[in-house]
Amino acid sequence: MMSQGGTVYLVGAGPGAADLMTLKGRALIEQADCVVYDALVSPVMLSWAKPGCEQVYVGKRAGNHALPQEQINKLLVECGRKYACTVRLKGGDPYVFGRGAEEAAALYAAGVAFEVVPGISSAIAGPAHAGIPVTHRSHCTQFTVFTGHEDATKTESTLDIAGIAAAKGTKVMLMGMSRLRSTLEQLMAAGQGGEVPAAAIQWAATARRRRVIATVATLADAVEQAGLGAPAVVVIGDVVACAPELDWYSRLPLAGKRIVVTRTREQAGELSSALSMLGADVTELPTIRIVPPTDRKDFAAAVVDSPHYDWLIFSSPNGVRKFFEAFFAVYEDIRELGGARIAAVGAGTAAELKKYGLMVDVMPKKAVAEELIAEFDRKADEFGGVANVTMLWVHSEKGRDVVYKELMKRQAIVDECIAYNTVPETEDPTGAKARLQEEGADLITFTSSSTVKNFMAMGIELPQGCKIASIGPITTATLKEYGLTPDIVSENHTIPGLVEAITAGFAS
């Protein structure tokens, strides 16, 4: 009988890439009160957790255990009794060499409710990411998966080397890099053909992937020469010969490029996802955080009065989101805005407005305030100018005042609606800063002046050879204030435009 309390979910994190997590797995992380995670879990997955969620690292790598398994079992029992929802996030699938069954048994014995959420195993996804199918009608119709790292407390091995050597089809070894040479020698001694194609894939199914292709007899030497290590998947079989034709990942335009995204934690997803889809290894290092404005009363009053204005002017997508969060706390219907016309600085802001069913009347081609003013001037005959017209300008606390000053010069009646403020991000739960400093990067992206200023305030030295990408002229100007000239500048000052510019930049 299960005791009263919460539920512990044993969730498979998949083979490495965050976008290969199951929908149920992500939903559980988003609602979790506590996440207990392993070493090979993508940091992006941890960023899905809600504010206040306790995150406990219990990673285990060969020879380096943050916490012994018995203590992990005890911890899960404690969390299950303390929290309504605990996610035990495990690389790959919880029940494929993941000791998930041991954890489930410990929870059952303690009377703690648990569920298992399967994940995509690296035994299948790792080879697939490297162009190697584990089955193929022309080569094999079965495959064998075995571990190269058995329980050290066993008095004798339960691994059937002779059976594996004699087995037909593809053979996949997980967690075997530290014993690769001896395992391959044992297999050949038991009858495994040394001339059979073999491959080792490090960081399989991630943008950091490295691959070595050889034969069973030569793979250990090839791995040493290439400097490959754990974590890795080893594949033995004729299907390895498919890799040159079926290696789709290496043909992606940003394959293997390490790119840093400095947007807010909430906004990073759009850019990160687009870059990842093109093959990039993305590190999210938020440098800013969106917080309420200093004067919340003024903001609330401006939102309440917004239906009385002739024009609403939005300077950023953040301004749109924060404005309408407050608007719908007061009004139930978007039509309460009345007949106000809408102006937006940039296509990104216009796209955010469209989510609320609002189309813009004025939008410059370039997402800068000066261009918005010029657009108002160009359309003066169409709208009758801005003199004596009431306008509510929705912007950030640290935004430039170009819009306000220029419209006032044209005798518009402009009120400000400060919808949010940006502050430096002080938390780094995923260790992104350390990863950047230790592993470097090919490119760092900046999407606003605030991201530049706060990144520089972190005191991080730019990695040697690292390029810089800027979303537009204002961000570029801020970079130059710090003596930095971006290598890539987006002509279309939107996230899709920045992605396009980055892709073109690396192609050249």
Can you name each region flagged by the protein language model?
Residues 1-18, 23-120, 124-125, 220, ...:
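Class I S-adenosyl-L-methionine
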Residues 6-10, 34, 83-87, 142, ...:
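Residue-level preference for the first positions of well-ordered beta-strands
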Residues 33-35, 55, 86, 133, ...:
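Short, well-ordered beta-strand core segments
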Residues 42, 52, 116-127, 142-154, ...:
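Conserved beta-alpha
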Residues 43, 72-79, 129-133, 157-161, ...:
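Short, charged beta->alpha transition segments
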Residues 153-199:
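Conserved anion/nucleotide-ligand pocket segment
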